[in-house]
Amino acid sequence: MKLLTRLLGVLLFLGATSSLLALQRNAFQNYRSEYGSGPGDERYEFSFTRLRFPTRTRGFGGFGGFRGGGWSEDYPKADRQFMEGVDRLTRLNGRPVQEVVDPDSDEMFNWPWMYAVNVSDWDFNPEQAKRMREYLLKGGFLIVDSFHGAAEWESFMAGMREIFPDRSVEELTNKDELFHVLYDLDERIQVPGYQYIWTGKTYERDGIDPHWRGIRDDTGRIMVAMGYNQHIGDAWEHADDPRYPERFSSFAYRLGINYIMYGMTH
């Protein structure tokens, strides 16, 4: 099934949305794609920014390029396909192509919203951890996705403690604005990876129950939003695949748009 046809079903299910006006925290830079092409002078209100991070086993997983690391799963299709949905569902002027940033680069501070995937073995040296901490405390918002089960949680938290050794992780509840800032997500579901097509299971390893967790700053703002035992990136990437259930992609789009709204207004 063609992408547009499949996405239309998802977007019609979601329905019309309110205008997303005045969301930008900073004036974004002119578009510069990793492929060296794109709109020249147009400026955007939002960019999907992906964190390229080092790991304990692979370093940056191909630091000189844009392939090979756990950070690049679903890349770039998930990022771009999600932004196609954002373009259709909102009036937000989003960049059509994603940005990729490293914790070593000052570029990170130009992009107040970041997504990271496969974070179970991420690892930061002291300077990188300091920069990540500074980014988040200055108003940055980080979404982490696709880590499953008790062992991966502990491994993920080892990296998280390098950034915030003293801040606690809390379970987010239905009272949190994150779940209501645009879409009311009172009934949340576990979004599985693509393996669901073959296994019929929404979970991986021992990660049977989905969790939405977070780390807050001193004002109560969520700085890090954690989708534990779920994989919304796969739902974005495979929204055009008729074998992947539409209910998962529909929820993933709504949750992702709420992430944008929350991150850019808090």
Give the residues covered by each predicted segment.
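Stable alpha-helical elements in mature extracytoplasmic
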Residues: 78, 82, 128-131, 152-160, ...
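Bacterial N-terminal signal peptides
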Residues: 8-19
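Short alpha-beta junction capping motif
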Residues: 48, 108-153
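An acidic, glycine-rich "communication" segment
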Residues: 27-32, 56-63, 152-233, 237-238, ...
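Aromatic-Pro/Gly-enriched surface loop or interdomain linker
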Residues: 21-113, 117-120, 231-266
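Surface-exposed patches in mature extracellular/periplasmic domains of secreted proteins
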Residues: 92-102, 144-149, 167-175
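Positively charged n-region of N-terminal signal peptides that target proteins for export
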Residues: 1-6
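Non-catalytic interaction surface on structured domains
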Residues: 87-91, 99-102, 107, 124-132, ...
